[in-house]
UniProtKB/Swiss-Prot annotation:
Biological processes, Gene Ontology terms: L-arginine biosynthetic process
Protein name (Swiss-Prot/TrEMBL): Amino-acid acetyltransferase
One protein family per Pfam: AA_kinase
Highest taxon, organism lineage: Bacteria
Species in which this protein is naturally found: Serratia proteamaculans (strain 568)
Gene behind this protein: argA
Sample GO molecular function, one term: L-glutamate N-acetyltransferase activity
The EC number(s) this enzyme carries: 2.3.1.1
Length: 441
């Protein structure tokens, strides 16, 4: 009998909402030269092919910094930088063009592979490169001539859209021409950022050596707002980190996010499958830079009843929560606060006020199993406490059979039945024997 993989089935089912959401959207993928020379690059190419097969419109931007430095070293030349930007003289430009040209051919060849027994079998991907970008010189700064180092003058977004409409992957490198016919060396982060903005891309995706941005404890930060990302850039630059994939991408991601690109994702080029995990799972695997959080705490509406029921039913079946019917939920929905992530209800709690006694009950606290080790319960408690204070309540109580210590750690103390509102005392279930915990607001 063939072995069945329920993990594969569950993973595929969970990815379907993201497949549908991403289809027809434009993504700009930024590949630094470090990613291209890594042994995992073949897998990254396969995953790019997978995205294309799912109907995602792809613009791939590649850099060549380490390859250019190797070429310079082979000619006994030192790279020259001014204010952390490469100075590209005529000799260096030839080496830049050589490195960029070889990478373009290599990436195109890899994406064109459709041999049997390979992930791209039968893909038949068209890869298109061209003069989609017109450059101009950076000029002279503090007496230093950047020579053939340039910046973007304009982008022919209509031409790029035509290629994407014809189901091609657009491949763009770090060399662009000017209106005078000269060639200029551009930074891959500027190219990727400007393309994402001009094409109104849904996402910009970058690769670095780590799995994203980490905090001081070394834990991956799953989500950053532009201001926080800017602070992280400044911290890294203070330690002399100007050219890593993380810093270069974050610079671009901050600009892109502030210019209308909804999400920018930073993932590792060393991790096989990082691109797929980041885009087709609820929590991803790297760091995303966003203007608005993928997760929000808000009051529940009638449309949230299905999600709340799905969340609390397993806890009701285990006897952890008191059973609530759909009809009861419909009548009490205005009492509920939820945490929603990518249209999934991952946590909920209700506040039942007793205004005459200046006290409220926090009830029906539930957190999705995947998020119980995080701070969602704390977020709900803070929100419910805030709501209770706004109502003029002075105390908050809970009835619990399983989470006694959790509430005690947050300022609740054991209490007797007689502290409850009269109405609640009459309904107290002595068979269930829930512990009563009370906190001052």
């Amino acid at each position: 009998m063939k072995e069945r993989s329920t993990e594969l089935v569950q993973g595929f089912r969970h990815s379907v909402p993201y497949i549908n959401a991403h289809r027809g959207k434009t993504f700009v993928v930024m590949l630094g030269g470090e990613a291209i020379e890594h042994e995992n690059f073949a897998n990254i190419v396969n995953d790019i092919g997978l995205l294309h097969s799912l109907g995602i419109r792809l613009v791939v931007v590649y850099g060549a910094r380490p390859q250019i430095d190797v070429n310079l070293a082979q000619h006994n030349l030192e790279p020259i930088y001014h204010k952390h930007t490469r100075v590209t003289d005529a000799h260096t430009l030839e080496l830049v063009k050589q490195a960029a040209g070889l990478l373009q051919l290599d990436i195109t060849a890899r994406l064109s592979m459709s041999l049997n027994n390979t992930p791209l079998q039968g893909a038949h991907i068209n890869v298109v490169s061209g003069n989609f970008i017109i450059a101009q010189p950076l000029g002279i700064d503090d007496g230093v001539d950047y020579c053939h180092s340039g910046r973007i003058r304009r982008i022919d977004e209509e031409a790029i859209h035509r290629q994407l409409d014809s189901n091609a992957i657009v491949l763009i490198g770090p060399v662009a021409v000017s209106v005078t016919g000269e060639s200029f060396n551009l930074t891959s982060e500027e190219v990727a950022t400007q393309l994402a903005v001009k094409l109104k891309a849904e996402k910009m995706i970058g690769f670095c050596s780590s799995q994203g941005v980490t905090n001081q404890e070394g834990t991956i930060i799953s989500e950053l707002f532009p201001n926080d990302a800017q602070k992280r850039i400044e911290e890294l630059e203070e330690h002399g980190d100007y050219h890593s994939g993380t810093v270069r991408f974050l610079r671009g991601a901050v600009k892109a996010c502030r210019s209308g690109v909804r999400r920018s994702h930073l993932i590792s080029y060393q991790e096989d499958g990082a691109l797929v995990q980041e885009l087709f799972s609820r929590d991803g695997i790297g760091t995303q830079i966003v203007m608005e959080s993928a997760e929000q705490v808000r009051r529940a509406t009638i449309n949230d009843i299905g999600g709340i029921l799905e969340l609390i039913r397993p806890l009701e079946q285990q006897g952890i929560l008191v059973r609530r019917s759909r009809e009861q939920l419909e009548m009490e929905i205005d009492k509920f606060t939820i945490i929603e992530r990518d249209n999934l209800t991952i946590a909920c709690a209700a506040l039942y006020p007793f205004p005459e006694e200046k006290i409220g009950e926090m009830a029906c606290v539930a957190v999705h199993p995947d998020y119980r080790s995080s701070s969602r319960g704390e977020m709900l408690l803070q929100r419910v406490e805030s709501q209770a204070r706004q109502m003029g309540l002075r105390k908050l109580f809970v009835l619990t059979t399983r989470s006694i210590h959790w509430f005690q750690e947050r300022g609740f103390t054991p209490a007797e039945v007689d502290v409850l509102p009269v109405e609640k005392q009459a309904l107290y279930n002595y068979q269930r024997r829930s512990k009563i915990l009370l906190a001052d607001l």
